[in-house]
Amino acid sequence: MTQEPLIRVDNVSFAYRINQSTSIPVLRNVSFSVMSGEYVAIIGHNGSGKSTLSKMLNGILVPETGDVWVSGMNTREKALHRQIRQCVGMVFQHPDNQIVATIVEDDIAFGLENIGVPPDEMKLRVDEALQAVGMSSFRDRPPHHLSGGQKQRVAIAGILAMKPSCIVLDEATSMLDSYGRKEILAVVGKMRREGMTIVTVTHHMSEVAEADRVIVLEEGEIVLEGTPREVFRQHQKLQELHLDVPQASQLALRIHELYPAFQRDLIQNQEIIEEVERHKLRQVEVSGR
């Protein structure tokens, strides 16, 4: 029996209306699916439509034409929006825009109160969510005393407490320093290992390299789609789209040009190290004959 996708985007188009006679097209006939447990990265330069697309995935925005389905629910149905948003939670670029309470644990509980979770279960969910993001010791702190990475972890905890099937990260690390990014990526890695469905919108190619699948947008259309290895193999196309590739991918290609036996489709630093070690071992074996 074929598994149904958790999210299905079907021929979606969207435009921002400036006035009654003027609109700006942002998405054009976009179609893709996200399976349960999958980690999908959406990339594209500024203005490509990726953040607009992310907001389609839980009904914040609704298509002009086409449909978005979440666990069989159409986002056009306003009566289903609460269920859809419990299924697909969003974490945005600025955590301050998501934090509403003056104490960390109260902020985690806020969404649970709104959906009528009983107090005993609420306490359990808050405890579990704070533990999941490594913020249990900060539960009594005011959010404004936290670092950017810590605030973003609180925002993620607030979503996790709702027990969603999928989390959408819309440029969730773009405003953080390197340490804050590492904090969030560690949390994302943990969620992924536990089977959470993740959709991330990002311009950090090192994050994209960790995904199962990459969707590349240009002027509101999908122009590339595949595994990170398949997408990053197309260096020239990515350059034309004004997108970077991971440094590891650039280095692997350069070494391959100089030494064709070296694999060119490497996208992570650890893969480069292992390939270098493999060739060192081969040289030792040859010289020992």
Kindly give the residue locations of the regions a language model identified:
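Conserved ABC ATPase signature
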Residues: P142-L146, Q150
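The feature captures the beta-strand-to-loop junction immediately N-terminal to the Walker
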Residues: I43-H45
